[in-house]
Amino acid sequence: MAKIENTFRTNINKNEGAPDSFCPLPWTHVSIKGNGAYRVCCHSAASESRGTVQDNNGNNSHISSAQWNDVVNSKMMKNVRSEMLKGNWPEPCIRCEREFKSGMKSRNIYERNILADITEPESYASYQKAKALTKEDGSISNKDFPVTFFDIRFGNLCNLKCVMCSPTDSNQWYDDYNKIWGYKNFWDSGEKIDLVKNKKNKLEPAKNIFEWSDDPNLWKQIYAHIKQFRRIYIVGGEPLMIDAHYDFLQKCIDVGVADKLVLEYNSNITNIPQRAWNIWKHFKLVIMGVSIDGIGEVNNLIRFPSKWWKIEENFKKFTQAEGRFDLHITSTIQILNIWQLPEFIEYLLTNNYSRVGPWEETPVMTPHPVHRPAYLNINILEDSFKQKLIQRFKEYKQKWNSTDWQKEYGDSNNATWEQKINHAKKILDRFETFMYSTKYEEQELIKWRSNSLHYLDKLDEIRGTDWKKTCPELYESMKVWYDLPKGLY
């Protein structure tokens, strides 16, 4: 697939001299969580503050009452901009900091490039422009920096209950959460959400903070800014299940801005209604971040209760669909799939789905490590298992370099193919670095390891899965943890 027409790669040149921490998002975008609260961005949830924006009274800024200008120039957002311009990593940006320092392509670097591709030069928030037009206290004006990027989670409606997820992002998690930990409440943005039994004897929130998509204050502000949008990022839950987002996209078509808009999703692509295909063909480009974490049973275990055959079927539908699509594999790497990671990469390299990573510089996948919950973070793994991983990674990299393998699966004289192979090897190198990036105190490490076994065993009991059979190499290294102290949950 050709690159987007009329791209503005020269925008990247305006980032010369930018500190590592610089990201254009605090200047150009508004982000909304699944509970309707405003946040710094989708990656800020890994921080202690969770990146939640607050008003002058210390309350969470919410779509039902907050105005966009107040959010953009809130104390947190002004501080984030000021810290970035000083060359510091702001507190909400800890996830990008960790990933960048491990050699990964962190979200802030990705945003510098993708926004340069899809934003008119006069609207692009380059480092030079940000430095010139941001006030000393970190505040900005809508005239200088219009909101061109809108990031929204329309609630937590989902059809899966992924291992690394929680009730905040999937309504399928309520009962399992209670059965695993014994809690009848959970927390989101500092608010305690009580769970009660409904008429079907299933747990649900006593006050459903995730049902807000028809709020008139939100739509008033969206429609006031809709003509300046150039990119919309839609997440869930599972966004393709949420009717409100299709109504929103239809409005974009009706007012005549769809052909200027790039849609970006994170979706498990297990459930794509015909309405989606009918709408997508009207937009400039649809970037689909495909949330899969392995092949076959590994993905079925992690993204329960998905079926691998259905995902492969929908990959094929994307290759034939009317419209412009760019699919990225946006995996979350954790203890359950780190062993299969090189095999997963090889699957993507050799299956050659035409719309998966179609651009010359597009990597074969854009994985990110699980930071939280810590009991799934690869940093807690035994050192002996990490050494086995390093050896396994080395063997795969050697295989990908071999002439015989290159002849069978690719064109060694093709620069694009060589670039993808090099990127595949870098993925393994970066995760090798990352799994040594966090040093835990002894008692903390014992807690996370003990929690890990409790968690995975309870999930098997509830769901009828078998993590030990699906991930035998991992189990062999973790079974010594059964001797650790219990009751640390």
Segment roles from a protein language model:
Residues 26-29, 35-38, 47, 90-93, ...:
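Extracellular structured ligand-interaction cores
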Residues 1-66, 70-71, 109-115, 174, ...:
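Radical SAM enzyme [4Fe-4S]-AdoMet core and its adjacent flexible, acidic
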Residues 147-157, 168-214, 226-243, 255-275, ...:
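Core AdoMet radical
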Residues 2-20, 26-29, 64-151, 169-172, ...:
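N-terminal [4Fe-4S]-dependent radical SAM core
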Residues 215-220, 246, 250, 275-276:
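Leucine-rich repeat
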Residues 23, 41-42, 93-96, 158, ...:
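Short cysteine clusters
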Residues 253-256, 321:
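Short, acidic, metal-binding catalytic loop of nucleotide-sugar glycosyltransferases
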